[in-house]
């Protein structure tokens, strides 16, 4: 009888040790997966930030091209690189192909932008823009509130809509 109890105790001990090690392995695997998941989540956040930063930098590049110019005729070609066809039409609703005779220069003094992602391929920006414009040697400073909608295309982010919301 004592041998049966000893064998049963040994088997029970063996089952308990096996269960203990199995549970330990499962816990270890779960911890590794949690760590890996955390690393991947951080990478996703980084990539989203890079995408967001990319749209913000393209928004800034658009305003620099739009407001920093010394020749109106060259300005169109510079801005066209940062817009979709629709965005270009919104940026210059009354443009003409005639050469300009008036000397106009403009300089972007400051830009403050606030963004809101609309979906994966569109982001809305509200921009507070301070610009100095010189026409025939007379300089004026103006603060504008401009809304831009960025659209993600295969070439990157482009301005798809421009609306002046008011003067500051």
UniProtKB/Swiss-Prot annotation:
The keyword Membrane applies. GO terms for cellular component: membrane. It is a single-pass membrane protein. Keywords: Membrane, Transmembrane, Transmembrane helix. This is Uncharacterized protein YddI. The chain crosses the membrane at residues 5-24. It is found in: Membrane. The lineage of its organism: Bacteria, Bacillati, Bacillota, Bacilli, Bacillales. It comes from the Bacteria. Its main location: membrane.
